[in-house]
Amino acid sequence: MSRFWHFKKFYFTSCYSMQRMRGKIFKNEPLVPMNVTSEHEQVQSISKEESRSLSSNDLNLSADSELQLESEPEIESEQLKNHEDVYEIIRSMVLAADTTLPRLSNNSLTGIYNHWKLNPNDDLPLYNPTKYTPYEFHSQYNQDRSYIITPRLSVTKLLVSSWCELRSFYQVYSGSVRLPSTKAMTQGTKLHSKLEAEVHPEIDTTEIEQFLISNAMSLRELQTTVPAEEETVVIDLGEVEQLAVDWAEMLIERLFSLIMGAEAREILLHGYLNLKNRSFVTNKDEIRESSSVLVSGIVDYIKLQNVTNPSDGTLFDDIHGFVDSAFDQVDNVPLVDLSQFLPEAKQILQNYDFRLTFTDVKTRSARQIPRQESVLEAAKFQTFYYRHFFHLLSRDSRFTYFSLIENAERRGHDVDKPLSILTTISLLRKHYHIFFKDFVKLANGEPIGFSPFDDSAKSIPYDFVSMFQSSDEFSLANPNHNHFLEQISAIDGIEYDSILSPLLKVWKTPPTLRYLAARASQLFNVFNENIGDITSVEYRYNKTSELLSEKVYDYNFSEFQAEVESASKFWNGEREVIPTEDLSRCSYCEFQSKCMVAGGKTTEAVEKKTIGPKIRQFLNECESSSKG
């Protein structure tokens, strides 16, 4: 009689038996995963007696449990013998006697064998033997803890068919082990930074920040009379501050640059994918539903242009003409009032047939583009995701505002927490042309002209005065800023007397993530009627930034939605995983040595090799059933 027949025969009866045994003997203790070794661990040789011991441990039969077993009078000895027979059959199918546990060649294999509780002599099964969907597992067992703290996906994670779906599948259940960075990846990152700096030159505020920190530490000793609950945070380098900087620079500044200069790089985008109906959320009430998964991405390049005449710059002549005539200047830089600029810019854009195009940049270590059709298709769909996200974020400023608020709150951030003084002054220095007029409004407690923010902004005293003094002239009652302004102006020559002096007071409304969400949502909405359907992928040589090729695509919503549905079914565990048919790709895969597809196994061999994993699935189901 075959082993598989034994398995089928005992499948239902033994699950019931295991539940009874767990209830009376094991006290619902969890199933302990087999301790699989990696190449860094010693190979274990298991004798016939050790085989029994290992299997007992695997089923959580400790010495104490066996003693307790003997002390249970209500369990008949014959019944125990039957139970032992069941376990003996299971053990014989899962782990043979005199077995040597092989070393697994990398951490990804070690992770998936431990998570799936597999015998390391077996190949990897082609299906998931656990109760967790890929998304559930990704959100609970992930080497990057930020995905556990804030469950979410990225655009690239949705492109599961790019190389091999089976590899993507195994990567999830390995615990999303990070692969080591390669030289090509490092060079690619440098190229992206270089391209970004060409459009958005970095303003180095290191010296100013060091001066402010040093000055703040000197003044702290003098501020002994300020109650702790009234003290404004001066220095905070936490996650809220980092998100604030990202929103200010990778949303507000980039979108403003897109309006003023026709192009922008590295813009943050996001959407909420409803895994139940396999589509992206389009109304704010649906954002908070548990089935709506946050999906984030960064689009490499967006250009605003006349698609029929790319050299046409009349739109930007009009916008610059308006800005130069409407706003005062400091150091020949207009101080833009966003409350006035946003509606005017939107009106100007509507008068022109200019459209946004969306580009992703792929870096290559050789002067050739990918030959695999699936890789090219995935790159195309990546640009479709970015185009779709921008469309959703530009449709309705209220939707985008609440979408950003939800984004921050899912990360555990308080959107009404005042930003630190250091973050505020840094944003002011780098982007005073955008933020100065708004900061004046916040300081005076004036509305910014966006009702969702104006109606909900909290009035919290924000001390933007005490820290901007020198220690030799410090006073809480009568602050004197003359020496301080001389010192900070000497660092980089900016007219701080013009952009800082009007703000040196206790603000009535502090700068917060909520404020940044409001302005970002309005800037997205400026482009509401200018979303184009052209996307492209640039392939660049990472050593020289040479453009090797550019693939241009027309956005197709039906085609895109089919891709979204397929990705949703993958992450929901609603369809079978499709392995690659190109086995030459397997040589680049960390799971190759244990993959049945990579090994070219026949259908009969694959069926035979899945018996062991089916037993593991059975054991996991019994464990879940006993806990329920």
From Swiss-Prot:
Its EC number is 3.1.-.-. Residues 38-52 have a biased composition (Basic and acidic residues). Binds 1 [4Fe-4S] cluster. Its cofactor is Mg(2+); [4Fe-4S] cluster. InterPro entries: EXOV. Keywords: 4Fe-4S, DNA-binding, Exonuclease, Hydrolase, Iron, Iron-sulfur, Magnesium, Metal-binding, Mitochondrion, Nuclease, Transit peptide. [4Fe-4S] cluster binds at C164, C586, C589, C595. GO terms for molecular function: 4 iron, 4 sulfur cluster binding; DNA binding; metal ion binding; single-stranded DNA 5'-3' DNA exonuclease activity. GO terms for biological process: interstrand cross-link repair. The keyword Mitochondrion applies. Residues 1-21 form a transit peptide. It is found in: Mitochondrion. Residues 37-58 are annotated as: Disordered. It comes from the Eukaryota. GO terms for cellular component: mitochondrion; nucleus. Single strand DNA specific 5' exonuclease involved in mitochondrial DNA replication and recombination. Releases dinucleotides as main products of catalysis. Has the capacity to slide across 5'double-stranded DNA or 5'RNA sequences and resumes cutting two nucleotides downstream of the double-stranded-to-single-stranded junction or RNA-to-DNA junction, respectively. Monomer. Belongs to the EXO5 family. This is Exonuclease V, mitochondrial. It comes from Candida albicans (strain SC5314 / ATCC MYA-2876) (Yeast). The gene is DEM1.
